[in-house]
Regions:
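Conserved ABC transporter NBD signature motif
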Residues: 62-78
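Helix-to-loop junction immediately C-terminal to a conserved catalytic motif
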Residues: 58
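Conserved ABC ATPase "signature" region
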Residues: 111-126
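Q-loop/switch helix immediately C-terminal to the Walker
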Residues: 86, 91-107
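Conserved ABC ATPase signature
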Residues: 129-137
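Catalytic Walker B motif of ABC-type/P-loop ATPase nucleotide-binding domains
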Residues: 154-158
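Hydrophobic anchor residue at the start of the ABC signature
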Residues: 143, 182
C-alpha cells in the first residue's frame, strides 16, 4: 500500500450475474471484474437495468442468478456507499446537520462534515435549511456523504444529475481522488465522465425485452 492509498486491495467479481425486478429479467449472465483504482461506467438507454444492477451489487435487491462478491482478505472496513438518484436529504435540517447525521449513521471515519462541505463547494451554505437548496446544490450535498465515512466501493446512480459544468468537474475530481486511494467506483450514467488521471471502463447494458 502506497502513502496515498487508504484502502486495502480489493477485487470485485460478477459471475453469471442476472438481475431484474417484479419478475422481469433486465440483464442476465453478466461477467466482469474490477480491481482497486478502477472505475466502471454502466451505460445504456432508460429501462435497461442500470439502477437495478447497482441495487443488486449493493445487496438491496437479490440477484436472480449468479453472484457479485468482493475479494478482500482480512479487511473489516464496511464495503460500500450507495448514492442513489434521489438525494435523501432532510429538508428541515441544516446542510451541516444533514451531513453530520450521515457521518454518525455510517461512522465518522472520513472528513469532518465542515471539511466535506468545503470540498463540494457548500461551505457558505452550512447553516441553511437543506430544503432551500437548488437541485444542483442538493446533489452536491448527497455527494458529500461519500467523504465523511470511508468506504472502498462507491456505487453511484446518475452522480452528475442536476449538476452544471462545474459540478461535472467536481464529480470527476472526487472520483479520481477516491480511485487514487485504492478505491473502486461503479456509476450508472447517461453523461460522459472524464477522469483526470485514468480512463473509466464501460459496461454497455442492452436490457432484455
Amino acid at each position: 500500500m502506497t502513502d496515498q492509498q487508504v484502502y486495502s486491495p480489493l477485487t470485485l467479481r460478477a459471475s453469471g450475474l442476472s438481475c431484474g425486478r417484479s419478475g422481469l429479467v433486465l440483464n442476465e449472465n453478466l461477467d466482469f471484474s474490477l480491481t482497486s483504482g478502477e472505475c466502471l461506467l454502466l451505460r445504456g438507454p432508460n429501462g435497461t437495468g442500470k439502477t437495478t444492477l447497482l441495487l443488486t451489487m449493493a445487496g438491496i435487491v437479490a440477484p436472480l442468478a449468479g453472484r457479485f462478491a468482493p475479494e478482500r482478505p482480512g479487511d473489516e472496513m464496511p464495503l460500500l456507499h450507495y448514492c442513489g438518484h434521489r438525494n435523501a436529504i432532510k429538508p428541515r435540517l441544516s446542510v451541516l446537520e444533514n451531513l453530520g447525521f450521515w457521518a454518525e449513521l455510517n461512522g465518522p471515519t472520513g472528513l469532518e462534515p465542515e471539511a466535506a462541505l468545503a470540498e463540494v463547494g457548500l461551505a457558505r451554505l452550512a447553516g441553511l435549511d437543506a430544503g432551500y437548496l437548488s437541485a444542483g446544490q442538493a446533489r452536491r450535498l448527497a455527494l458529500a456523504r461519500l467523504l465523511v465515512s470511508l468506504r472502498p466501493l462507491w456505487l453511484l446512480d446518475e452522480p452528475t444529475a442536476a449538476l452544471d459544468a462545474a459540478g461535472h468537474g467536481l464529480v470527476a475530481r472526487l472520483l479520481d481522488a477516491h480511485l487514487a486511494k485504492g478505491g473502486l467506483a461503479i456509476a450508472a450514467t447517461h453523461d460522459p465522465i472524464s477522469l483526470p488521471d485514468r480512463a473509466p471502463r464501460v459496461l454497455q447494458l442492452e436490457g432484455i425485452w
